[in-house]
Amino acid sequence: MDGMPDAIAWRDVGSIDDIPPLGARVVVAPGGNIAVFRTGDDRIFAVDDRCPHKGGPLSQGIVHGARVTCPLHNWMVDLASGEAVAPDSGCTRTIPVRLDGRRILLSIQTGA
């Protein structure tokens, strides 16, 4: 180990048009599946595709506003923070995401 931090790379994972409004898409990544969400007002969020409660697939949940409801036990997760909405508690990892025109880019750590 040389003490150097891992490099950050932006990975193109498709077009915003590939995800319906209030929908999601799964991106397979080395660290596990990532759920990429599109809100009704075309905001894009990305989180680990695992509910902090029992590991349910958030990508199969219902998107409302900037939240998703897990399909297993109806936990709500804030897509911006990854935090479960009270009274539930827990957190799923968020992944930096940006739009370049209509292209969705995820920030993926790579070994430098």
Task: Identify the role of each PLM range.
Residues M1-G65, C91-A112:
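N-terminal pre-ligand scaffold of iron-sulfur
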Residues C51, C70-H73:
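Short cysteine clusters
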Residues P57-H64, W75-A86:
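Iron-sulfur (Fe-S) cluster-binding segments and ferredoxin-like electron-carrier domains
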Residues G65-P71, A84-R93:
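Short cysteine/histidine-rich metal-coordination sites, predominantly Zn2+-binding motifs
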